[in-house]
């Protein structure tokens, strides 16, 4: 009888830990952690007068919704920041539709939509929504430190360290 109870408790703990591991390591959870990290860095390192809006959601006239990770409002302009919490080597340039993430010593490759283009869409939408000239917006993509972006060809992409 006691063995059955012990077995059930151990099995329950094993299942609970497996579920927690999957939830905490889901792409959505990793993305949120990355966004929080970049928000903290922006708040601590940008000098002078600034306003930071994190996780802005708005709906366009056509009904499409947009989510922007960070907007940094400075006297020099409005910086629209897209955060990527990826690991491994990242390959791509501003003109390509898709970029490639390479992990596990080249054994695993994932394609993802070019974040510079993604953020350009955010800027167009925000500019239209605010009836503002696009020239005041700066496009910035930030990968967290575990990503190797040395293979990216873009002046808009940075690493948060």
Model-derived features with residue positions:
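Surface-exposed interaction regions that form or flank ligand-binding interfaces
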Residues: 1-66, 73-78, 84-89, 98, ...
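Acidic/histidine-enriched active-site and ligand-binding environments that engage anionic O-linkages
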Residues: 91-93
């Amino acid at each position: 009888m006691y063995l059955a109870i012990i077995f059930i408790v151990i099995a329950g703990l094993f299942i609970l830990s497996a579920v927690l591991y999957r939830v905490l390591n889901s792409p959505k959870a990793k993305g949120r952690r990355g966004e929080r990290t970049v928000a903290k860095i922006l708040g601590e390192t940008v000098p002078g007068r600034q306003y930071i809006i994190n996780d802005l959601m708005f709906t366009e006239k056509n009904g499409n919704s947009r989510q922007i990770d960070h907007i940094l409002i400075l006297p020099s302009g409005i910086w629209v920041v897209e955060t990527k919490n990826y690991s491994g080597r990242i390959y791509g340039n501003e003109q390509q539709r898709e970029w490639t993430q390479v992990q596990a010593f080249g054994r695993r490759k994932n394609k993802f939509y070019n974040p510079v283009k993604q953020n350009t869409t955010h800027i167009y939408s925000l500019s239209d929504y605010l009836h503002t000239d696009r020239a005041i917006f700066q496009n910035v993509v930030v990968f967290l430190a575990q990503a190797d972006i040395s293979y990216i060809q873009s002046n808009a992409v940075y690493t948060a360290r």
